[in-house]
Amino acid sequence: MKLILLGPPGAGKGTQAEILNKKLNIPTISTGNILRAAVKNGTPVGLQAKAYMDAGKLVPDEVIIGVISERLAEADCQNGFILDGVPSTIPQAEALEKVGITFDAVVSLEISDEEIVERMGGRRVCASCGAPFHVKNLPPKVEGVCDACGGKLEARADDKPEVVRDRLKVYHKETAPLKDFYAARNLLKTVENQPTVAETTTAILKALGL
């Protein structure tokens, strides 16, 4: 199954993607991770991306789409994948269509702005392996310690309320219009935020008919 996960920052896309890739046995493809991997591996589009990143510039859509196309051509993506964080704009969605990348469903996680602000204040990330946690919704077994690798859990600077509100403004302007874009293609599955991570996963699987 080829999926896109949509939703505002802090909606739990990363957490749900990790759960779904284990349940469905398909990889999660996040923009940040594949950009870093392409740069590290020195692929042609990775080198292009590195030039922009080193200059402190935004990586243009055509390079991002190139990196994604490169990643989706790998063997582990042939039975499906989950895209997290891309497309983030209508032009990116159109570019994916143009290069022939198709999807079975687009899941939009729905949650209010106020709940996002509260939720993101409780997020923690492992400084060593990047595993996500939350002080309330997904706490580690030992406070401040990563379950996976024993690394130190940290709050992110961009989870401060004023920063979150700015990011939400960008989301509503740039990314939220993708819901109409994919609804017009009969791909959109809307999933309301649930009280727990597990309940949200169940709602996603139900929306997908799984």
Predicted regions and their residues:
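Glycine-rich phosphate-binding loop of ATP-dependent small-molecule kinases
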Residues: 1-210
